[in-house]
Amino acid sequence: LMTVEPMFIEGKPFTAVTVKLPKTTLLVISNDVGYIMCGALDVDLLNEKLADRNIISGRAVGVKTIQQLLDAPLEKVTNASIAYGWRAGLIGKEALMLIS
């Protein structure tokens, strides 16, 4: 099952995506600038193999719902996201507001 829903954080538009898979759930909250995602995100791949794309992204681990993703600290962020003030430990919602 997959759901794609519009959501607003402090009045700013984002898209929340939930993909239920066997034994795991993929979670993403995005806008036109970047996204935060569950632990399935391979930040190292984005930094090393896709560095030329300057992808703004961060991952939070151990989250099982969109709300948990918003409330969790980011465990790792892409190099490109640092220019937006993102860093490990930044709360997901706060990171999204920095790109809104």
Protein language model features and the residues they cover:
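Residues that scaffold, gate, or flank divalent-cation-dependent active/transport sites
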Residues: 2-100
